[in-house]
UniProtKB/Swiss-Prot annotation:
GO terms for molecular function: 2-dehydro-3-deoxygalactonokinase activity; ATP binding. Belongs to the carbohydrate kinase PfkB family. It comes from Haloferax volcanii (strain ATCC 29605 / DSM 3757 / JCM 8879 / NBRC 14742 / NCIMB 2012 / VKM B-1768 / DS2). InterPro entries: Carb_kinase_PfkB-like, KDG_KDGal_kin_Halo, PfkB_dom, Ribokinase-like. This is 2-dehydro-3-deoxygalactonokinase. Homohexamer.
Protein backbone atom coordinates (compact mmCIF):
# COMPACT_ATOMS: atom_id res chain seq x y z
CA UNK A 1 0.00 0.00 0.00
CA UNK A 2 1.23 3.49 -0.90
CA UNK A 3 -0.23 5.94 1.58
CA UNK A 4 -0.86 9.56 0.68
CA UNK A 5 -0.12 10.63 4.27
CA UNK A 6 2.44 8.99 6.55
CA UNK A 7 2.75 10.00 10.20
CA UNK A 8 5.43 9.07 12.73
CA UNK A 9 5.20 9.08 16.52
CA UNK A 10 4.02 7.35 19.67
CA UNK A 11 0.53 6.02 20.30
CA UNK A 12 -0.35 5.40 23.92
CA UNK A 13 -3.06 3.67 25.87
CA UNK A 14 -5.42 6.30 27.32
CA UNK A 15 -6.98 5.44 30.68
CA UNK A 16 -9.63 7.66 32.23
CA UNK A 17 -12.06 7.36 35.16
CA UNK A 18 -15.79 7.89 34.58
CA UNK A 19 -16.79 11.53 34.23
CA UNK A 20 -16.89 13.26 37.59
CA UNK A 21 -14.69 10.68 39.33
CA UNK A 22 -11.08 10.99 40.50
CA UNK A 23 -8.25 8.66 39.56
CA UNK A 24 -7.41 7.95 43.19
CA UNK A 25 -10.92 6.71 43.99
CA UNK A 26 -12.28 5.38 40.67
CA UNK A 27 -13.19 1.68 40.52
CA UNK A 28 -12.94 1.51 36.73
CA UNK A 29 -10.96 3.13 33.93
CA UNK A 30 -12.02 3.61 30.32
CA UNK A 31 -9.51 2.15 27.86
CA UNK A 32 -8.72 3.93 24.57
CA UNK A 33 -5.75 4.61 22.30
CA UNK A 34 -4.26 8.05 21.73
CA UNK A 35 -1.28 9.76 20.14
CA UNK A 36 -0.91 13.01 18.24
CA UNK A 37 0.45 11.52 15.05
CA UNK A 38 -1.95 8.58 14.89
CA UNK A 39 -4.83 10.92 15.74
CA UNK A 40 -3.88 12.98 12.69
CA UNK A 41 -3.73 9.85 10.53
CA UNK A 42 -7.18 8.74 11.71
CA UNK A 43 -8.77 12.12 10.97
CA UNK A 44 -7.26 12.19 7.49
CA UNK A 45 -8.24 8.59 6.79
CA UNK A 46 -11.84 9.12 7.82
CA UNK A 47 -12.02 12.02 5.36
CA UNK A 48 -10.90 9.87 2.45
CA UNK A 49 -7.12 10.30 2.51
CA UNK A 50 -5.13 7.06 2.56
CA UNK A 51 -2.99 7.16 5.68
CA UNK A 52 -0.28 5.11 7.35
CA UNK A 53 1.32 5.34 10.79
CA UNK A 54 4.99 4.52 11.35
CA UNK A 55 6.27 3.55 14.80
CA UNK A 56 7.64 0.92 17.17
CA UNK A 57 5.51 -1.08 19.62
CA UNK A 58 5.88 -3.88 22.16
CA UNK A 59 4.86 -7.28 20.82
CA UNK A 60 2.13 -7.65 23.41
CA UNK A 61 -1.66 -7.41 23.70
CA UNK A 62 -1.28 -3.69 24.48
CA UNK A 63 0.78 -3.06 21.36
CA UNK A 64 -1.61 -5.08 19.22
CA UNK A 65 -4.53 -3.11 20.64
CA UNK A 66 -2.99 0.01 19.11
CA UNK A 67 -2.70 -1.45 15.61
CA UNK A 68 -6.16 -3.00 15.78
CA UNK A 69 -7.68 0.37 16.69
CA UNK A 70 -5.91 2.18 13.88
CA UNK A 71 -6.96 -0.37 11.28
CA UNK A 72 -10.56 0.07 12.44
CA UNK A 73 -10.33 3.64 11.14
CA UNK A 74 -8.57 2.77 7.89
CA UNK A 75 -5.02 3.62 8.96
CA UNK A 76 -2.34 1.11 7.99
CA UNK A 77 0.27 0.62 10.76
CA UNK A 78 3.89 0.03 9.76
CA UNK A 79 5.38 -1.17 13.02
CA UNK A 80 8.67 -2.50 14.28
CA UNK A 81 7.77 -4.99 17.01
CA UNK A 82 9.94 -5.32 20.13
CA UNK A 83 9.60 -8.34 22.41
CA UNK A 84 11.12 -6.63 25.44
CA UNK A 85 9.74 -3.08 25.28
CA UNK A 86 6.82 -1.53 27.12
CA UNK A 87 3.71 0.29 25.98
CA UNK A 88 3.34 3.97 26.87
CA UNK A 89 0.15 5.12 28.56
CA UNK A 90 -1.45 8.19 29.98
CA UNK A 91 -4.16 8.80 32.53
CA UNK A 92 -6.57 11.68 32.09
CA UNK A 93 -8.91 13.03 34.73
CA UNK A 94 -11.37 15.40 33.07
CA UNK A 95 -11.77 18.63 34.99
CA UNK A 96 -14.73 20.85 35.69
CA UNK A 97 -14.27 24.44 36.85
CA UNK A 98 -12.59 25.25 39.14
CA UNK A 99 -10.73 21.89 38.94
CA UNK A 100 -8.49 21.62 35.83
CA UNK A 101 -8.10 18.55 33.66
CA UNK A 102 -5.11 16.52 34.84
CA UNK A 103 -2.88 14.35 32.63
CA UNK A 104 -0.42 11.83 34.09
CA UNK A 105 2.08 10.26 31.68
CA UNK A 106 3.51 6.76 32.04
CA UNK A 107 5.56 6.66 28.86
CA UNK A 108 9.19 6.40 30.03
CA UNK A 109 11.16 3.73 28.13
CA UNK A 110 8.28 3.03 25.77
CA UNK A 111 9.18 1.03 22.66
CA UNK A 112 9.10 4.04 20.36
CA UNK A 113 11.82 5.87 22.32
CA UNK A 114 14.46 3.58 20.79
CA UNK A 115 13.14 3.67 17.20
CA UNK A 116 15.87 4.17 14.60
CA UNK A 117 15.44 4.72 10.84
CA UNK A 118 17.08 1.37 10.00
CA UNK A 119 14.29 -0.37 11.95
CA UNK A 120 11.46 1.43 10.18
CA UNK A 121 9.71 1.15 6.80
CA UNK A 122 11.29 4.35 5.50
CA UNK A 123 10.25 3.60 1.91
CA UNK A 124 6.64 4.52 2.70
CA UNK A 125 7.83 8.03 3.59
CA UNK A 126 9.58 8.33 0.23
CA UNK A 127 6.45 7.24 -1.65
CA UNK A 128 3.95 9.42 0.26
CA UNK A 129 2.48 12.75 -0.77
CA UNK A 130 3.03 14.13 2.74
CA UNK A 131 4.88 13.18 5.92
CA UNK A 132 3.80 14.47 9.33
CA UNK A 133 5.20 14.40 12.83
CA UNK A 134 5.11 16.72 15.82
CA UNK A 135 7.25 18.24 18.56
CA UNK A 136 6.06 15.55 20.94
CA UNK A 137 8.14 12.91 19.17
CA UNK A 138 11.63 14.44 19.52
CA UNK A 139 10.77 15.30 23.13
CA UNK A 140 10.61 11.62 24.08
CA UNK A 141 14.30 10.69 23.68
CA UNK A 142 17.58 11.72 22.11
CA UNK A 143 17.24 8.77 19.74
CA UNK A 144 13.90 10.07 18.56
CA UNK A 145 15.31 13.55 18.00
CA UNK A 146 17.80 12.04 15.59
CA UNK A 147 15.25 9.73 13.96
CA UNK A 148 12.75 12.55 13.48
CA UNK A 149 15.40 14.63 11.73
CA UNK A 150 16.46 11.74 9.51
CA UNK A 151 12.87 10.95 8.48
CA UNK A 152 12.20 14.60 7.65
CA UNK A 153 15.39 14.64 5.59
CA UNK A 154 14.35 11.45 3.79
CA UNK A 155 10.98 12.99 2.96
CA UNK A 156 12.58 16.22 1.74
CA UNK A 157 15.00 14.39 -0.54
CA UNK A 158 12.14 12.32 -1.96
CA UNK A 159 10.02 15.39 -2.72
CA UNK A 160 7.45 14.46 -0.08
CA UNK A 161 5.75 17.46 1.53
CA UNK A 162 6.76 17.68 5.19
CA UNK A 163 4.42 18.91 7.92
CA UNK A 164 5.31 19.52 11.56
CA UNK A 165 3.20 20.59 14.54
CA UNK A 166 5.11 22.37 17.31
CA UNK A 167 2.78 20.65 19.82
CA UNK A 168 4.63 21.77 22.97
CA UNK A 169 4.17 19.67 26.11
CA UNK A 170 5.56 21.23 29.29
CA UNK A 171 5.58 17.84 31.05
CA UNK A 172 8.04 16.50 28.46
CA UNK A 173 10.64 19.28 28.14
CA UNK A 174 11.45 22.91 28.79
CA UNK A 175 10.68 25.73 26.33
CA UNK A 176 14.39 26.23 25.64
CA UNK A 177 15.01 22.53 24.92
CA UNK A 178 11.95 22.44 22.68
CA UNK A 179 13.09 25.56 20.83
CA UNK A 180 16.59 24.21 20.19
CA UNK A 181 15.34 20.85 18.96
CA UNK A 182 12.47 22.12 16.83
CA UNK A 183 14.40 24.96 15.22
CA UNK A 184 17.02 22.43 14.13
CA UNK A 185 14.24 20.57 12.29
CA UNK A 186 12.56 23.60 10.71
CA UNK A 187 14.80 23.76 7.60
CA UNK A 188 13.33 20.37 6.61
CA UNK A 189 9.69 21.44 7.14
CA UNK A 190 7.32 22.75 4.45
CA UNK A 191 4.15 23.18 6.53
CA UNK A 192 4.36 24.35 10.13
CA UNK A 193 1.36 24.12 12.45
CA UNK A 194 1.55 25.74 15.88
CA UNK A 195 -0.77 26.98 18.59
CA UNK A 196 -0.38 30.71 19.16
CA UNK A 197 0.43 30.08 22.83
CA UNK A 198 3.22 27.65 21.86
CA UNK A 199 4.78 30.13 19.45
CA UNK A 200 4.99 32.69 22.23
CA UNK A 201 6.19 30.26 24.92
CA UNK A 202 8.68 28.23 22.89
CA UNK A 203 9.83 30.44 20.03
CA UNK A 204 9.61 33.67 22.06
CA UNK A 205 7.96 35.70 19.30
CA UNK A 206 5.60 38.62 19.87
CA UNK A 207 2.83 40.25 17.89
CA UNK A 208 -0.64 39.30 16.73
CA UNK A 209 -1.28 35.96 15.01
CA UNK A 210 -0.85 37.22 11.41
CA UNK A 211 2.45 38.83 12.41
CA UNK A 212 3.63 35.60 14.07
CA UNK A 213 2.80 33.61 10.93
CA UNK A 214 4.60 36.08 8.69
CA UNK A 215 7.69 36.17 10.91
CA UNK A 216 7.90 32.39 11.00
CA UNK A 217 7.48 32.11 7.25
CA UNK A 218 10.19 34.69 6.72
CA UNK A 219 12.64 33.36 9.30
CA UNK A 220 12.43 29.68 8.32
CA UNK A 221 11.17 29.76 4.72
CA UNK A 222 8.08 27.65 5.43
CA UNK A 223 5.75 27.20 2.47
CA UNK A 224 2.72 27.38 4.78
CA UNK A 225 2.33 28.43 8.41
CA UNK A 226 -0.87 27.57 10.28
CA UNK A 227 -1.55 29.24 13.63
CA UNK A 228 -4.32 27.77 15.78
CA UNK A 229 -5.91 30.21 18.22
CA UNK A 230 -8.42 28.27 20.32
CA UNK A 231 -11.74 30.11 20.50
CA UNK A 232 -10.39 32.70 18.05
CA UNK A 233 -10.14 30.15 15.26
CA UNK A 234 -7.13 29.59 13.03
CA UNK A 235 -5.22 31.28 10.26
CA UNK A 236 -2.76 30.25 7.58
CA UNK A 237 -0.11 32.19 5.73
CA UNK A 238 0.56 30.79 2.28
CA UNK A 239 2.05 32.47 -0.77
CA UNK A 240 2.26 35.78 1.04
CA UNK A 241 -1.47 35.82 1.83
CA UNK A 242 -3.03 35.31 5.27
CA UNK A 243 -6.32 33.39 5.42
CA UNK A 244 -8.44 33.42 8.57
CA UNK A 245 -11.00 30.86 9.76
CA UNK A 246 -13.36 31.26 12.74
CA UNK A 247 -14.35 28.33 14.92
CA UNK A 248 -17.65 26.51 14.51
CA UNK A 249 -19.90 26.51 17.54
CA UNK A 250 -19.85 23.22 19.40
CA UNK A 251 -21.16 21.56 22.54
CA UNK A 252 -17.92 20.12 23.93
CA UNK A 253 -17.85 16.58 25.33
CA UNK A 254 -14.07 15.96 25.14
CA UNK A 255 -11.56 18.52 23.87
CA UNK A 256 -8.52 16.21 23.82
CA UNK A 257 -7.42 15.54 20.25
CA UNK A 258 -9.15 18.60 18.78
CA UNK A 259 -5.92 20.04 17.38
CA UNK A 260 -4.98 16.71 15.82
CA UNK A 261 -8.40 16.48 14.17
CA UNK A 262 -7.84 19.94 12.71
CA UNK A 263 -4.42 19.00 11.35
CA UNK A 264 -5.58 15.69 9.87
CA UNK A 265 -8.44 17.36 8.04
CA UNK A 266 -6.27 20.27 6.90
CA UNK A 267 -3.60 17.96 5.46
CA UNK A 268 -6.18 15.72 3.80
CA UNK A 269 -7.49 18.69 1.83
CA UNK A 270 -4.02 19.94 0.89
CA UNK A 271 -3.13 16.46 -0.36
CA UNK A 272 -6.37 16.43 -2.37
CA UNK A 273 -5.23 19.63 -4.10
CA UNK A 274 -7.69 21.96 -2.39
CA UNK A 275 -6.70 25.58 -1.68
CA UNK A 276 -5.44 26.55 1.76
CA UNK A 277 -8.63 28.41 2.69
CA UNK A 278 -10.70 25.27 1.99
CA UNK A 279 -8.28 23.17 4.04
CA UNK A 280 -8.64 25.63 6.93
CA UNK A 281 -12.42 25.37 6.84
CA UNK A 282 -12.32 21.57 6.79
CA UNK A 283 -9.90 21.61 9.69
CA UNK A 284 -12.14 23.86 11.76
CA UNK A 285 -15.27 21.83 11.01
CA UNK A 286 -13.57 18.54 11.84
CA UNK A 287 -12.18 19.98 15.07
CA UNK A 288 -15.68 21.08 16.09
CA UNK A 289 -17.07 17.60 15.44
CA UNK A 290 -14.22 15.95 17.36
CA UNK A 291 -15.19 17.93 20.47
CA UNK A 292 -18.58 16.20 20.48
CA UNK A 293 -17.20 12.66 20.97
CA UNK A 294 -15.24 10.98 23.76
CA UNK A 295 -11.64 9.96 23.21
CA UNK A 296 -8.77 11.42 21.21
CA UNK A 297 -9.94 10.25 17.79
CA UNK A 298 -12.02 12.23 15.31
CA UNK A 299 -14.70 9.63 14.60
CA UNK A 300 -16.36 11.69 11.89
CA UNK A 301 -17.51 11.29 8.29
CA UNK A 302 -17.09 13.53 5.23
CA UNK A 303 -20.85 14.10 5.15
CA UNK A 304 -20.81 15.35 8.74
CA UNK A 305 -17.99 17.76 7.97
CA UNK A 306 -19.81 19.04 4.88
CA UNK A 307 -22.94 19.55 6.95
CA UNK A 308 -21.05 21.69 9.46
CA UNK A 309 -19.58 23.72 6.60
CA UNK A 310 -23.08 24.29 5.24
CA UNK A 311 -24.26 25.46 8.66
CA UNK A 312 -26.39 22.41 9.44
CA UNK A 313 -27.99 22.22 12.88
CA UNK A 314 -27.62 19.55 15.55
CA UNK A 315 -31.19 18.34 15.60
CA UNK A 316 -32.33 14.74 15.29
CA UNK A 317 -31.31 13.15 11.97
CA UNK A 318 -34.25 10.88 11.09
Amino acid sequence: MTAELVTFGETMIRLSPPEGERIETARSLEFRTAGAESNVAVAASRLGCSAAWLSKLPDSPLGRRVTTELRTHGVEPYVRWDDDARQGAYYIEQGRAPRPTNVIYDRADAAVTTARPDELAVDIVEDAAAFYTSGITPALSETLRETTGELLQTATEAGTTTAFDLNYRSKLWSPSDARDACESLFPKVDVLVAAERDIRAVLELDGDAPTLASELAGDFDFETVVVTRGEDGALARHGGTVYEQPVFETDTVDAIGTGDAFVGAFLSRLIAGEPVETALAYGAATAALKRTVHGDLAVVTPDEVERVLRGGDAGIDR
